[in-house]
Amino acid sequence: MFPMVTEFMNYGQQTVRAARYIGQGFMITLSHANRLPVTIQYPYEKLITSERFRGRIHFEFDKCIACEVCVRVCPIDLPVVDWQLETDIRKKRLVNYSIDFGICIFCGNCVEYCPTNCLSMTEEYELSTYDRHELNYNQIALGRLPMSIIDDYTIRTILNLPERKT
């Protein structure tokens, strides 16, 4: 008779434990009901990037001294710097500068170590194209500043991000 009583008690304890686990899961589900949605309607709503966001690289041709520091600090030797030596003034003259964003890992080393600050990171992150070769930007394409998300009247910016509890 005692084994039947202990089995019945174990069954009761397991039932209470299962009900408690179901209740805890239900409370977690209900706590998420009042939160803001994490997803956004992408083409029409965009998040404002942080101050230190590493987006597309902006290049200022006039500031570059063709020192090739950006090539040396790049982990994949990505920037292509073509220059000619001006013999009369004994200085390098920059001819061409290009970066292939299909290969770039956006580490930011080139921007950080540039002695003349001719490289900077922008907030542009939309680099999708149908042709891979369009991701190879020369000095003209790198020199264009992207339109700021805040200034674009057709896009609603999301300022208040839902806070995450860690």
Swiss-Prot record:
Xref: Gene3D superfamilies: 3.30.70.3270
Names of required cofactors: [4Fe-4S] cluster
GO biological process terms, semicolon-separated: photosynthesis, light reaction
Entry EC number(s): 7.1.1.-
Pfam annotation, one family: Fer4_10
One term under GO cellular component: chloroplast thylakoid membrane
UniProt keyword annotations, A-Z: 4Fe-4S, Chloroplast, Iron, Iron-sulfur, Membrane, Metal-binding, NAD, NADP, Plastid, Plastoquinone, Quinone, Repeat, Thylakoid, Translocase
EC class of the enzyme, as a word: translocase
Residues that, per the record, bind [4Fe-4S] cluster 2: C74, C104, C107, C110
Disulphide-bonded residues: none
Family indicated by similarity: Belongs to the complex I 23 kDa subunit family.
Reported function: NDH shuttles electrons from NAD(P)H:plastoquinone, via FMN and iron-sulfur (Fe-S) centers, to quinones in the photosynthetic chain and possibly in a chloroplast respiratory chain. The immediate electron acceptor for the enzyme in this species is believed to be plastoquinone. Couples the redox reaction to proton translocation, and thus conserves the redox energy in a proton gradient.
Protein name per Swiss-Prot or TrEMBL: NAD(P)H-quinone oxidoreductase subunit I, chloroplastic
Organism this protein belongs to: Coreopsis petrophiloides (Tickseed)
Gene name tied to this protein: ndhI
